[in-house]
């Protein structure tokens, strides 16, 4: 019974959510589109012609926004453990990003080139138990950062969803070694009760740049 009440409450909140209604009106697949749009309005992260990887892409809200902004000369590779309906000119890699085979497929799609931007809205299925949820969430953050380190061009950018809790401070410390500037963003469209926020990382230093920083 308690579970049914919780589910009903979630459904009521979801359908009364102004961003859900706005997404339906504007043709976006997810309310999450507005999180990226808010960051874009503030930081001008995405530009025409860019090469971008979108992690945790399904159902496609961020990919819709990104594809429109990069235009026909850009390139977008999206990936998620869930299926995603196709978006024109978007390469989709379906599978569990924690598996090496999926990483290999993404790297194959990237090819010998580098990308300008990696964005990650990945999050685990939450149990409500911080001792379980935080390690899972931080593991996904670490994997996203690992990919960014492999594929970003020097000067490239990285946007990643994070959660405050155990492991965050160490992650934040490490990421600051790799980028010239790291800022926190909490879009208005994030739900009030959510502990999520985003780290906006500008100016990838490259592996050599990070190693040089480590020496000082």
UniProtKB/Swiss-Prot annotation:
Catalytic center residues: 161 (proton acceptor)
Main location: cytoplasm
A GO CC term assigned to this protein in UniProt: cytoplasm
Listed EC numbers: 2.1.1.166
Catalysed conversion reaction: uridine(2552) in 23S rRNA + S-adenosyl-L-methionine = 2'-O-methyluridine(2552) in 23S rRNA + S-adenosyl-L-homocysteine + H(+)
Protein name as it appears in the record: Ribosomal RNA large subunit methyltransferase E
EC class of the enzyme, as a word: transferase
Role, per record: Specifically methylates the uridine in position 2552 of 23S rRNA at the 2'-O position of the ribose in the fully assembled 50S ribosomal subunit.
Residues engaged in binding S-adenosyl-L-methionine: 60, 62, 80, 96, 121
């Amino acid at each position: 019974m308690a579970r049914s009440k919780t589910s009903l409450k979630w459904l009521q909140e979801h359908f009364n959510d102004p961003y859900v209604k706005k997404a339906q009106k504007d043709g976006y697949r997810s309310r999450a589109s507005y999180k990226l749009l808010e960051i874009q309005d503030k930081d001008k992260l995405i530009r025409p012609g860019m090469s971008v990887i979108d992690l945790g892409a399904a159902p496609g809200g961020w990919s819709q926004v990104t594809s429109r902004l990069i235009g026909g000369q850009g390139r977008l590779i999206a990936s998620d453990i869930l299926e995603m309906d196709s978006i024109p000119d978007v390469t989709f890699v379906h599978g569990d990003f924690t598996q090496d085979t999926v990483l290999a497929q993404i790297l194959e799609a990237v090819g010998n080139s580098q990308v300008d931007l990696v964005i990650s809205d990945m999050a685990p299925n939450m149990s409500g138990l911080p001792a379980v949820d935080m390690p899972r969430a931080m593991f996904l953050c670490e994997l996203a950062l690992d990919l960014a380190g492999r594929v970003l061009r020097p000067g490239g950018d990285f946007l990643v969803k994070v959660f405050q809790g155990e492991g965050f401070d160490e992650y934040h410390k490490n990421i600051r070694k790799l980028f010239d500037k790291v800022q926190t963003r909490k879009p208005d469209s994030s739900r009030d009760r959510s502990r999520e926020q985003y780290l906006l990382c500008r100016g990838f230093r490259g592996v050599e740049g990070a190693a040089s920083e480590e020496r000082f």
